[in-house]
Amino acid sequence: MTAAYLPSILVPIIGIIFPGLTMAFAFIYIEQDQIN
């Protein structure tokens, strides 16, 4: 029963949080590169 609800939870996490983390790490890397 709970397995049917897993995709509705994993898809937003992969589609929203993962790109958000990628952009955050890219932003931090660029900011550190500019400071140095």
Curated annotation (Swiss-Prot):
Q: Where the protein is mainly located, per its record? A: plastid
Q: Which Pfam families match?
A: PSI_8
Segments traversing the membrane: 10-30
Q: State if Transmembrane is listed as a keyword.
A: yes
Cellular localisation:
Plastid, Chloroplast thylakoid membrane
Q: Which UniProt keywords apply?
A: Chloroplast, Membrane, Photosynthesis, Photosystem I, Plastid, Thylakoid, Transmembrane, Transmembrane helix
Gene Ontology terms describing biological process? photosynthesis
InterPro entries attached here? PSI_PsaI (IPR001302), PSI_PsaI_sf (IPR036357)
Asked if Transmembrane is a keyword of the record, the answer is yes
Q: How does it sit in the membrane?
A: Single-pass membrane protein
May I ask which residue range the UniProt record assigns to the signal sequence?
none
**A cellular-component GO term for this protein:** chloroplast thylakoid membrane
Return the SUPFAM superfamilies for the record.
Subunit VIII of photosystem I reaction centre, PsaI (SSF81540)
HAMAP family xrefs: PSI_PsaI
User: Into which family does the record put it?
Assistant: Belongs to the PsaI family.
**What job does this protein perform?**
May help in the organization of the PsaL subunit.
Protein name per the record: Photosystem I reaction center subunit VIII
Natural source organism = Guillardia theta
> What's the encoding gene here?
psaI
